């Protein structure tokens, strides 16, 4: 399988203007899944325009936000400058298929991030960056029978199921808290309805 989600792909994506969704509000699952957590250190793996990272920082977390696109990070930092939480944010330009952080985090999250590697391998990789007792939050595109694609993303590379994600987690190491699949609609450019099919997995690392 080939993977087109390289740096050039994401720089083009973020240079497209409003359609790249840099000004969108944070993902609605974020508040629901983290409301009971004590703020600590967090990694946003594939932070894009920074909405989720900024939201976390605004709620007391110290966030490392990593993305392969310098254009995305520039937009995110500009947005953060008016948030009142920029001192709790660190922006890192990184290829998440090869980069490794120098610490583990109380929360590792990713929202619709697609590096140049198989999707499930990516989730397995970032799971290793969660500290004992910490939380992994994955929000991704749901693969459903009969689907033909999700936006500009090749379906086979961009979508998963909750069962496929949790199957990669050793039951001795993880407690699965959430493993949901949702269908929702958001308003896109020009007021058009955009259907989304989401996978939401939250797990706590036991050790």
Regions from the language model: what does each represent?
Residues 69-71:
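Conserved SAM/SAH-binding beta-strand->alpha-helix loop
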Residues 76-77:
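Conserved SAM-binding loop
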Residues 133-141:
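Conserved beta-strand signature within the Rossmann-like core of class I S-adenosyl-L-methionine
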């Amino acid at each position: 399988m080939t993977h087109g989600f390289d740096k050039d792909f994401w720089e083009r994506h973020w240079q497209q203007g409003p359609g790249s969704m840099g000004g969108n509000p944070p993902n609605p699952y974020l508040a629901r899944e983290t409301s009971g957590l004590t703020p600590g250190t967090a990694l946003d793996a594939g932070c894009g325009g920074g909405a989720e990272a900024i939201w976390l920082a605004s709620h007391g977390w110290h966030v490392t936000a990593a993305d392969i696109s310098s254009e995305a990070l520039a937009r995110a930092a500009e947005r953060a400058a008016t948030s009142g939480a920029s001192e709790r944010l660190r922006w890192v330009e990184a290829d998440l298929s090869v980069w490794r952080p120098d610490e583990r985090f109380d929360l590792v999250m990713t929202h619709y991030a697609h590096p140049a590697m198989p999707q499930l391998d990516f989730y397995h990789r970032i799971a290793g960056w969660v500290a004992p007792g910490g939380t992994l939050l994955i929000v991704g595109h749901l693969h459903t029978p009969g689907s033909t694609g999700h936006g500009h993303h090749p379906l086979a590379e961009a979508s998963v199921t909750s069962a496929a994600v949790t199957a990669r987690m050793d039951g001795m190491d993880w407690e699965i808290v959430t493993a949901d699949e949702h269908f929702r609609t958001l308003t896109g450019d020009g007021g058009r309805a955009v259907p989304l099919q989401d996978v939401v997995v939250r797990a706590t690392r036991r050790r």
